[in-house]
């Protein structure tokens, strides 16, 4: 009797796990990111992405994390007949929030001028297309802008090139329109 009860509990638990699909992988675009998705039913998912948005160009160092809640919609029946022989095509749209930092060493010719530090927060959006293969692999292409205020500080290291050794400013993060930009994601579904 205990064995039957154990098997029944295990079967119910496995159905509950299967009903909440997850995917883990990476996104590659303007930067590189770790990506995790957790499904809520068949039409919603929570996406968590964290990584470096700039690929370390010109002595850069950066980090960013974004969480979005996405609504998933299948493509129409006509599209599915032609392009979905074994897999499944979906499009999705979502909103969320994100934050990050960006630091780079400013240089003119061979002289280091100082450090420029940015911290940004904002509202994130996401729109994309995904293909779920008949085996546990997912490919997607999406655009995920992150817009909001950014706070930055210039630190003069040579004491000559800038009138004030520290300059603090606040403005709108226009880089967020392309830094989260169009990305290709590859994820393992489990």
Predicted regions and their residues:
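Repeated loop/turn-to-beta-strand initiation elements of outer-membrane beta-barrel proteins
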Residues: 5, 22, 43-48, 74-79, ...
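Positively charged n-region of N-terminal signal peptides that target proteins for export
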Residues: 1-4, 16
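Residue-level detector of intrinsically disordered/flexible regions characterized by low predicted structural confidence
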Residues: 4-5, 189
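Short glycine/proline- and aromatic-enriched beta-strand/turn motifs that initiate or cap beta-hairpins
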Residues: 17-70, 104, 183, 187-190
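A periodicity- and composition-biased signal for non-globular, repetitive helical segments
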Residues: 8-9, 150
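Hydrophobic h-region of N-terminal signal peptides that target proteins for export
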Residues: 10-18
């Amino acid at each position: 009797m205990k064995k039957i009860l154990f098997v029944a509990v295990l079967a119910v638990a496995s159905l509950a796990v299967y009903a909440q699909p997850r995917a883990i992988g990476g996104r590659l675009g303007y930067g590189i990111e770790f990506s995790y998705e957790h499904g809520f039913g068949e039409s919603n998912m929570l996406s968590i992405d964290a990584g470096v948005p700039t690929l370390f160009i010109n002595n850069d160092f950066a980090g960013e994390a974004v969480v979005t809640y996405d609504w998933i919609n299948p493509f129409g029946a006509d599209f599915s007949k032609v392009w979905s022989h074994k897999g499944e095509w979906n499009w999705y749209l979502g909103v969320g929030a994100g934050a990050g930092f960006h630091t780079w060493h400013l240089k003119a010719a061979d002289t280091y001028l100082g450090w420029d530090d940015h911290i940004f927060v904002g509202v994130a959006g996401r729109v994309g297309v995904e293909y779920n293969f008949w085996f546990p692999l997912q490919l997607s292409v999406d655009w995920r802008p992150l817009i909001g205020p950014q706070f930055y500080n210039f630190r003069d290291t040579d004491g000559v090139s800038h009138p004030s050794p520290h300059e603090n400013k606040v403005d709108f993060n226009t880089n967020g329109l392309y830094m989260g930009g169009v990305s290709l994601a590859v994820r393992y579904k489990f």
